[in-house]
Swiss-Prot record:
Coiled coil regions in record: none
Region named Disordered: 169-191, 229-266
Biased composition (Basic and acidic residues): 233-249
Protein's recorded name: Non-structural protein NS2
Function, as annotated: Single-stranded RNA-binding protein.
Species this chain originates from: Bluetongue virus 10 (isolate USA)
Top-rank lineage group of the source organism: Viruses
InterPro entries (alphabetical): BTV_NS2, NS2_N
Keywords, comma-separated and alphabetical: RNA-binding
Family indicated by similarity: Belongs to the orbivirus non-structural protein NS2 family.
Biased composition (Acidic residues): 250-260
Amino acid sequence: MEQKQRRFTKNIFVLDVTAKTLCGAIAKLSSQPYCQIKIGRVVAFKPVKNPEPKGYVLNVPGPGAYRIQDGQDIISLMLTPHGVEATTERWEEWKFEGVSVTPMATRVQYNGVMVDAEIKYCKGMGIVQPYMRNDFDRNEMPDLPGVMRSNYDIRELRQKIKNERESAPRLQVHSVAPREESRWMDDDEAKVDDEAKEIVPGTSGLEKLREARSNVFKEVEAVINWNLDERDEGDRDERGDEEQVKTLSDDDDQGEDASDDEHPKTHITKEYIEKVAKQIKLKDERFMSLSSAMPQASGGFDRMIVTKKLKWQNVPLYCFDESLKRYELQCVGACERVAFVSKDMSLIICRSAFRRL
C-alpha cells in the first residue's frame, strides 16, 4: 500500500492595506490588519490581529498570483477580489510571481502572551494577474542549439543514470593508520617498514627482503671491523647473557682467563649490529666526520654527542660516568635510550638504559 506524503501546516498572513482582495476586505470588515490562510489537510482563512510564530507575512498591493519560495517549501496563492485559492502542491498551468522570504526576529502576542518569535516576511508586487495561462507546454521540448531529444522520458533517464552509477566499480580506500609497534621506530626503521609493506607477498618479495638485509650487513662490515668469531658466538648463545657478563667480569678465575685468551668472548649481539647499521645509514651530520668504532667492556670517551630515546631488545647495556667520562658494561638486555659518544676521531654507539654513576 502506497504511503501517503505527510503534510505540514503552513500559515500565511496576508497584509492588504488597500482591501482590494477578498483577504483584505475580510480583515477590514473585522477591523483586523491580517487575514490568516491556513493550508494543511484543509484550507481555511480568518481575520487575525497579529501573525503567529514561524508564519509567513505576505504583503500585497492587490490581486495577483503569488508563489512563496522558502527553500524546498513552495506555496502558491491566487488572490482575487472575490476568492482565494492556495496549495503547496505543483500548480504549473498558471503563471505566478515568485516571492522570496526574509526571516525576522520579532516579539508577537501568541496565546495571550508576548513571546520572542521568528516570522518570514515576503512582499509581492502584483505584476502577475490571477489565472494567466502558462503557455509553456512541459511535454514539448523547445528548439535549443546543441541539444537533441533523448529516447527516454525524464523518469526513465533518471533511473538509467542511477543504475549506471550504482553498477560502476567503486575504488576501495584502505586505512593508513600507523600500527602500535611503529611508535618506537626510528625514521629509518619506519621507512624500511613501509617499503616492506609495499612488497607483494610471495617468493619474489621474500627474496627482496633477504637481499636488502644482506646489503645492510655488507655496508656495515665495510665501515666497521667487528672482529667477531663464529665459534665464540655459538658459545655465547649456549651459555646465555648472564654467563657472558660473568665471564667478562670474573678476573680471578684463571681457567676462564686462559680460555678467553685463546678465544676472546664478545658482548656484541646480532641485534646490536643490525641497529647500529641502521644508525650509520642515516648519515647524521653530527657523525659525518667520525669513523665508527666498537665499544669495549669498559673505556673512556671525550664527549657526549647526543642521546636518543629508542626501545630495543638483546643489546649490551652500559653505565656512564660523565664526570670521569667513562663507560662500563653492565649486562645484555633491553634498553630505552642510546648514547652517541666520541673518542678521539671515532664514534661509539652505546645502547643502554642510560644512567649516570
